[in-house]
């Protein structure tokens, strides 16, 4: 994952805890209902979400003067990191008006660009247990299920849902006074340096504004921790990826230990062991009108299988299942020379994939699947986000990457997006209507969160990719280059040409 990752809060000093709380705007967390499930059924949990601290207004205590404007610090308020943390406060958020975040029942909608007094790009939110603590998920021998609508996410965008090994209180007990209520304590496996506050000090020393992002920059420090990417996706490509670290919890890095000169110098695995169906050789599995049809909402099931079938076992396998239109769809099978034809992430899969693609073995060197399992056992925070990529334009997800390699080389092609796509200036300028919707989050015992009707339990069974009737159903594919399925539509819908490759019934 290559996210814009920003952490505010954390201080180990006893004199003053870093990152204060502002009083200019009340903080009202949007509600989000989700479910805990067992073989007996599912029970509602009345949850809430909070906005990551980095998106929030950061101002001088007791007035309205910005501590940080654009991508620069005010050095009169922030002459050094310690003083800055003592002087600056986080404030409440206007979720819908400023950030384009709305919730309704079990659904959370994140708009990519929101125009208010200023232009906001993207967002990152965390599921809360209460108003002061994040919900902690222990995922071993469990499954996590959610619905997602990526139909309005084009090339270059990423609707990412993942877990991060953050502190439940956002560091409030030891490092700051704002805490999880205000979205503090973020970290991930990229050891991001675009974090404004870390270990109770502003990351202002050595800070340089980004040359292509008016809101971000990088400082001397970064925040590292384990990350389990359940879902990184747009309408063209998707991937799920474990990223282990050598040490538990949030670890601060500095200089080259934050990958300043060497991507693989950190304590965490930046690459992960990813399963992207397109990259793994099935180029007709995921996308508009494909087996998993991104024109429609998708139910995504991820299972964390242990070696002894108990919560105390060792992580052995990470499985992926989809449900769409009441049908269970098994994950695509690998079709790459040198990799066994499976459809899940295991230690063997990761070893073979790294060898077949010629990738660095940073995943194995940081503990591999066992290391990821340890983080899952300790507990992780759920992150829901939408973002674009100012580093490499999201090509690692949906196009050819790296660009200096031949697309014919195994592992280079990850999707059908153009090599010129995903530039932030383009996707941000053409962002009308771009959004992601997450809904129906469920967590519980294996096979308790879904069945052939999309919920409730039962063992998965495979489905075909084409309807049995001679006419296509409403919203189904009815034409396009290479299409061999039905070309007539069930009444009252008719077939409409969307592009050369895809026609749809509506």
Swiss-Prot record:
Location of the active site: 227 (nucleophile), 232 (proton donor)
Family annotation (Pfam families): CBM_1, Glyco_hydro_7
Coiled coil: none
InterPro entries: CBD_sf, Cellulose-bd_dom_fun, ConA-like_dom_sf, Glyco_hydro_7, Glyco_hydro_7_sf
GO MF annotations in UniProt: cellulose 1,4-beta-cellobiosidase activity; cellulose binding
Region entry Linker, spans: 451-473
Signal peptide segment: 1-18
Region (Disordered): 405-426, 449-472
Residue span of region Catalytic: 19-450
Gene Ontology annotations for the cellular component aspect, listed alphabetically: extracellular region
CBM1 domain segment(s): 470-506
Ranges of biased composition (kind: Low complexity): 460-470
EC number, as in UniProt: 3.2.1.91
A biological process term (GO) from this entry: cellulose catabolic process
Top-level taxon of the source organism: Eukaryota
UniProt-annotated glycosylation sites, renumbered to this chain: 308, 447
Keyword tags: Carbohydrate metabolism, Cellulose degradation, Disulfide bond, Glycoprotein, Glycosidase, Hydrolase, Polysaccharide degradation, Signal
Function: The biological conversion of cellulose to glucose generally requires three types of hydrolytic enzymes: (1) Endoglucanases which cut internal beta-1,4-glucosidic bonds; (2) Exocellobiohydrolases that cut the disaccharide cellobiose from the non-reducing end of the cellulose polymer chain; (3) Beta-1,4-glucosidases which hydrolyze the cellobiose and other short cello-oligosaccharides to glucose.
Listed name of the protein: Exoglucanase
Protein source organism: Agaricus bisporus (White button mushroom)
Recorded name of the encoding gene: cel2
